[in-house]
Amino acid sequence: MAFEDQRTTVYKIDPAHPGSETLPTLRTEELLLNMGPQHPATHGVLKVILELEGERLVKSTPVLGYLHRGVEKLAEDGTYHQFIPHTDRLDYVCAMYNNFAYCRAVEKLMNITVPDRAEYLRTIVAEVQRIIGHQFWLGTQALDIGAMTVFFYCFRDREILMDWFDELCGARLTTSWYRIGGVERDFTSSLLGKLKQFLDYFPPKIDEYKVFLETNRIWVGRTKGVAIISAEDAVSFGLSGPTLRGSGVDYDLRKAQTYSAYPKCEFSVPLGKNGDTYDRYWIRVQELYESVKIIRQCLEQMQDGPIMADVPSVTLPPKQRVFTNLESMIQQFKLFSQGFDAPRGEIYCGTEAHKGELGFYIVSTGGGKPYRLKIRAPSFIHMGAFDHMSRGYMISDAVTIFGTYDIVMGECDR
């Protein structure tokens, strides 16, 4: 199917002068339509006021804040360790990334070096979470557009990794497995065996997803040429992740500001050409292959060693020592109840989550609690481009365009 920008009716565009727009000779009365608020079961409550001319979108105004819980303010009232479970409730579809990004920010503030084995464990779990996130997006986006079969296939394979998370940390969604200075627990032989088995099982399943969608004329027709954004506009709006790389911008924090075990792994960063919904789908599928490649390399390179930095004034003691040693029990109690004494200063640390750049900005005036914590959530940033990317498309494209960002309102509203 040839590439074609589907914005053609509301404003007539002169091909010779694409920057100029003229009104059509026949204009209908504009209509305001409320899309949402939706039920919380749809991963967040969102209202978008759509301004229509016929069936074409003239303007889209997102109304945010229905899921605002004051998460950033809560950070000021608890210790640094106590805030980790709160991060689970941001993007609750992929909580591991929230834990990871927050812990990296605190470690940067405290100048803590994480042990090598812990870095490999973190990277493996982060890439497993990326696979889960992209499977969730692919299944629900396909379902919204009309390809129901892919939804069942994606969630079938996602369940394998959700059960793996359950065995790893006792939770499927709100995980709280990452710790400041390391991780909560190591992999067991059972977890390693199941993960290796999944790495052999999964790549052929990705091929199945592609066959189902790329040979589906409805899917191709509803994604190619829809929600186009240029590289310049994508950068101007502050987009990141697959949404930015779909426009051909080569920017991935795992490469640009590399961290954890990523410098020791070889992987590619897929880039789109047209900046449309189809390119963003293609990038996410390619990232599934790359995540498998990264996990394999980490498993091959990982050596035995500690999983927590040895900084008694900041990091938690091993749980077995807490049960058998009085000093370790007191250390854990004090770290959770009083916190550690952070230096004065401010830092920002960004992490490449599956949606885009997830960053934490922390201002410390000393003491055991942050003075201010600000979260840079990719979902919130991407919602700012919704009006720009939806103008001129059909009302039936609104759900497709909203889904192309992979937005979770818990992260957006906070």
Which residues make up each language-model segment?
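Metal/cofactor-centered catalytic core regions of large enzymes
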Residues: 1-414
